Amino acid sequence: MSAPAGRLQPQRFAALPNPVTAENKFWRSFKVPVVAKEYSAITSIHFSAESPYDFAVTSGARVQIYGASSRSVKKTIARFKDTAYSGNIRKDGKLLLAGDATGLVQIFDLSTRSILRALDAHQFPVHVTQFCPYANTTFLSGSDDKTVKVWDLSTGAVQYDLSGHEDYVRTASWMSATRLVSGGYDGTIRLWDTRIADPEVMSFSHGEAIDVVLPMQSGSTVISAGGPSIKVWDLVAGRQTPTKKLSNHQKSITCLAMNSENTRLLSGGLDGHVKIYNISDWKVVHGMKYSGPILSMGLSPDSCNLVVGMSNGTLSQRTRRITKQTSSKTPFLGGVGSAFGVVGKKKQIYKGENDEFYVEEARRKRLRPFDKALKSFCYSDALDMVLENGSPVLIITMLIELLHVGGLRIALSNRDDLSLTPLINFLRKYIRDPRFSETLCIVTSTILDIYGAALGGSVMVENAISKLREKVEQEVAVTQRANELVGMLQMLSA
Amino acid sequence: MAVRSRPQLAFQTEKENGIGITAFNETAKLYANVVEALDAQRLRIFDSVAGSLKTEYILEKEKVISCIAWEQKPLYASEQITTDISGSGEILVLGTNSGEILIYSEHLGSLTRTYSFGILQKIIGAHVLANDGFAIDITGKVVCFSVNTGEVRTSFTVPSSSREFSGLYLSTVFKNLALASSHNIHIVDLNHRNPIDSLTTHTSMINSVVFQYLKDENKFYFGVSANQDRFINLYSKELDGTGEFPTNTVKNVGALVCENEVKMLSIAYEIENPETGVLAALTNDGTIEMFENPWLSKLRQNGTNASSLSHRRKLLTSHSTLKICFCRSRGDPPIVLESIAFESTDSLTVVWKESTRTVFETVPWRILSSQATNGLIELVRSKTRLTSKNKTVSNVYDESNATISSGVMQKDLRKTEEIGSAEAMEGEEQEPSLAERLQNLTKLDQQAQALSTQISASTSLSTVLTQALKTNDQSLLESCFNNNNVETIDTTIRRLDPSLAPILLDKLAEKLALRPMRADVLMVWIRCTLITHGGHLVLVDDLKHKLANLHSILEDRASKYSSMLALQGKLDLVLSQIAFRKAGGSKDNAEDEEPISIYYEGYEESMDEASSTGDEGYSSDDSVDNEMYSDEENSSKGAFPDEENENRELSEDYSGDESLENSESE
């Protein structure tokens, strides 16, 4: 007797291609958006290197420090006479550096918000300032007066005045304690080494006004973005042609960022897109759309917070929730529990003496109602139960099982219009699915065999059947075309 | 209570661009409204009892409906509408902006007549009483026509000082008595084409009129409400039972006051007991105010002559006896209602919009009136689940619905800027000089030429598709594949870089596997790509490997061809059998057919063999639909006990199944 034993195992089908990659999943896990609106465009976002990774947002004539966990403003520094630029937090999280449109470079104590230094050596707006991540007392500033200056914090004096750019300097960054890279509107990237007398070491021509340069951690590669393209420069080879050119944006790229593992590059542009590249092959692995043109972007060092600033003053923060690993009971706590007489709830099972062999009882999952019906040969009931509230896969599984045990005809016969219509509706819904169609064809044929023209007795069933026919006609047309296409493919790949 | 009630027709007309044109039929069971769809207006008919949409009819694109009304049953004898127009159901009359009258049959579900008289402009009121149709246009031109033939019986213009009319209201009691409304009310005798009376009633446009005839007093009462007016004026007109309508017998019998501006009126009264009328007024804020016995003024009740004019006035105006409103929660502002109508004197049907859904509710107001506090019944109707579902949808990231935690709303900020710039603009505005104008003209010409050359580019999606393929952007790709215009697909693929073709095919294969129902469109894409970029694809090395995915998916699909075709054949057979049987074909055949077997005494043995082969096909039928053939079977039972047995054997598989089934289910 071929009675099905136990639970019905769901039918397995060939896996469908999954368009969602692991990468997509990861970047989509940045959700829980919080949006703040500022008065004017957000020109810079800088994350503190220190946990909890607060960040400085520069917009209009103020710099705001946002708390990473609360995602709201913690401190506001508004002691600027004109538009502020490039708020930058020192790696220990104690000082903030910012330039402004008058050319003043100011350093603030973040705990008291008092001005520690106000340095007035630039004549034109200072668009970029950065603390040296390798030395606490050094920082750089780049200005529209075409120069980059390296400062000593303790004395407030300019240590090096690096001139060579032929237009505004809009971006600069430290590569090591003595080496810098800067880019400007003259379309060149210049590398500086402060140790030598003639500090300009190397220069590359990007071709378009550069908005942002980003040196990679390895120190051998610099990424520059200007216009709608990103170029990757190899410093070791020192060639004048970029090793890679990425043109995935429709409009100017305004900001670049790296994740802390230095494996992914993020770029944001005026087209409102943030694109994420895998730096091993420079392929876009994910993209995100924002509501406005993006001017600035920051990814927190723990890769939990993605902050994007837009030209309409919108600041969007997306946060990834890290699920804490539930730590298993520490041995210490267990010890304490037992010491205080807390007894574990686990029941003692007699496992026999040493010389006895204990046969463990196999645990069985409980049978579902339709399993029971199937077991007791109530095929029709089993099918009805599944049809009522089962997933399509379960219904298909049931139908296949019925076919195997030879109960399909029994399950399908003796039905009135009310019990037949849901089945026909299911057929109509899924007969076009290539995974199911084979089984469903057999089921449909069986129904037609059993009932034949008697199906016309009920208006409901007749309607359902004629709708089913429409679907089948469509599918016939599709399969016919599929046949044609297979022919085409054979011809091409022969 | 076996009292027949006869509620008046409630309707509402004249709203810009068709929104808000609604009508209940006389029994308040059907509700029609006109909604603005993307390109054309749609007529929707709802069953107000079940609360479901019955039919939706898409009107022709250029037709803009300006008024709508259901057929009314006159109380006087009249010619009926032919069934090819009405479909023996109710009909709906629609007036358009261009002066056309459309007749829609609810049963047939289509427009059955379109009349255009050529003399009418925008129609603001149209009615059908049996075979008599009436229409009035915005200038006050009235046309009476036959619904069956479309022949114009009379047409005339209502003489009036006002430039614009708002509606026409017909009596169901008296033939040829109508009220035309503008700012004023004109009582019109349609037979003599002349207005009997002209009353100055309101300062604004009249939006609703209700009336009732009291036989005992031989008086005709009517109530009038207007836009932006809280007062409902009540009048009575005395009739002299000669069939002619006397002039100058109209009296103002009072006024009803609502708390808000009145949107529409509805009235109901019992035919047997006409004194007990009830009038409902729907106000703009969504409150319904009920006035019981509206015509019975306090003046008459008291029976005394009021001493002063102000006192008289006070007595003439009366407030509502009951207010009903629907709200989301207690104390909230009421839900704005679309329309109301009396089902009977005791219950009121109410319609409102719940986002895109239309919700109906019947209010048994007389029963509820005991629960009223301060004369107000608040019925709490929380938002339906449908809208709460929308809420979960809004969790999807979107800047527009995200919570703003700090800063100012950009929207408000922009407003202030705009005002500033607008002010600045006013100062600078100056007329352009002739030279500037000429320059502008040439510029425009150049732009037009440039546009015409770029049309081909705008019909293709190649830039979007290229970007989507390059950046692996699923949503962008999806937006391309959603396009099912063959021409667009063709141009898009033609403009696509051939090197992207393998990637495109791969993506198409993925989509095809995930969404088998969309195969129609996706296969057009695949076909176009193979044809257009076939030349390049041949050159790609290892193409077989690269397109293995697509190949297997297509092959899998293609392999279903024969079984699907067979199934189609089976379905065709069964469906045509059904059709055949419905046409009565099988019965005729059964009668024509020779008897299956004839019993001859003495030939039993030889007959049995012959009949058994002949019966084989038939017996399976028998077991399936016993009902159809049971008679024949019964008749044959007595005659052929042997054959009966054989039948059983033949249909073993069926009957066997049945018995097994029965035993198991027990």
UniProtKB/Swiss-Prot annotation, chain A:
This protein's record includes keyword Acetylation: no
UniProt keyword Ubl conjugation present: no
Question: Which segments carry the WD repeats?
Answer: 37-76, 79-118, 121-161, 164-202, 205-243, 248-287, 289-328
Q: Name one GO cellular component term.
A: t-UTP complex
The molecular function terms in GO held by this entry are: snoRNA binding
Any Pfam family the entry gives:
WD40
Principal location class: nucleus
Q: Which SMART domains match?
A: WD40
Q: Name one GO biological process term.
A: maturation of SSU-rRNA
Q: Which proteins does it associate with, and in what oligomeric form?
A: Component of the ribosomal small subunit (SSU) processome.
Listed PANTHER family: U3 SMALL NUCLEOLAR RNA-ASSOCIATED PROTEIN 15 HOMOLOG, UTP15 U3 SMALL NUCLEOLAR RNA-ASSOCIATED PROTEIN 15 FAMILY MEMBER
Q: What is this protein called?
A: U3 small nucleolar RNA-associated protein 15
- According to its UniProt entry, this protein's organism is Schizosaccharomyces pombe (strain 972 / ATCC 24843)
UniProt gene name: utp15
Curated annotation (Swiss-Prot), chain B:
Q: Which InterPro entries match?
A: SSU_processome_Utp12, U3_snoRNA-assoc_WDR, WD40/YVTN_repeat-like_dom_sf, WD40_repeat_dom_sf
In its keyword annotation, does this UniProt entry include Chloroplast?
Answer: no
Question: Acidic residues composition bias: which ranges?
Answer: 618-633, 641-666
Predominant subcellular localization, coarse grouping: nucleus
Q: Which UniProt keywords apply?
A: Nucleus, Repeat, Ribonucleoprotein, Ribosome biogenesis, rRNA processing, Transcription, WD repeat
What is one Gene Ontology biological process annotated in the Swiss-Prot or TrEMBL record? maturation of SSU-rRNA from tricistronic rRNA transcript (SSU-rRNA, 5.8S rRNA, LSU-rRNA)
Q: Where are the WD repeats?
A: 14-56, 60-114, 201-246, 259-301, 316-362, 495-535, 570-609
Q: Which Pfam families match?
A: Utp12
The family annotation for this protein states: Belongs to the UTP5 family.
* Quaternary context: Component of the ribosomal small subunit (SSU) processome.
* Protein name as annotated: U3 small nucleolar RNA-associated protein 5
| Organism lineage | Eukaryota, Fungi, Dikarya, Ascomycota, Taphrinomycotina
